[in-house]
């Protein structure tokens, strides 16, 4: 009986943690969408590189970004998957910082989902081409910052 109760409690805890993670990922995605453009920092040898991005989508509880495999930024992400993202809300007084590691997802499902959510990219990318790259964040930490409120941090 105790073993069944223990297993039940473990299952419930896992479900709560999973739900919290999904909510955190969605919160980060919504914030990025509100900002519009976000900037991702990578490393090229010993030189930092920063570029504007605009695609952030949630699939299967993971936050995805999109780029092209032929781009230098993709090669940098594969050589060193650690990154930082920052974005500022239109007010200019609130911003987000995100760090973690990026994992390439070559599945057609992920590519198609991200492209379907961002149809303007379909003139340059396809779920079936060898160039489209969608990457998801692992070990993500998001810091929501403001000039007038304490920083809030969530992990996803």
What annotation goes with each model-predicted range?
Residues 56-91:
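A short mixed-secondary-structure module that forms the rim of ligand-binding clefts
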């Amino acid at each position: 009986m105790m073993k069944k109760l223990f297993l039940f409690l473990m299952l419930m805890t896992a479900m709560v943690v999973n739900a919290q993670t999904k909510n955190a990922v969605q919160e980060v995605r919504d914030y990025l969408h509100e900002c519009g453009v976000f900037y991702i920092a990578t490393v090229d040898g010993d030189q930092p590189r920063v570029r504007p991005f605009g695609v952030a989508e949630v699939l299967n509880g993971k936050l995805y970004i999109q780029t092209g495999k032929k781009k230098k930024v993709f090669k940098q992400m594969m050589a060193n998957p650690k990154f930082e993202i920052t974005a500022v809300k239109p007010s200019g007084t609130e911003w987000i910082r995100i760090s973690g590691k990026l994992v390439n997802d070559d599945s057609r499902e992920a590519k198609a989902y991200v492209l379907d959510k961002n149809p303007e990219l379909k003139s340059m990318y396809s779920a079936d081409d060898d160039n489209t790259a969608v990457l998801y964040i692992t070990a993500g930490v998001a810091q929501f910052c403001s000039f007038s409120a304490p920083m809030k941090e969530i992990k996803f």
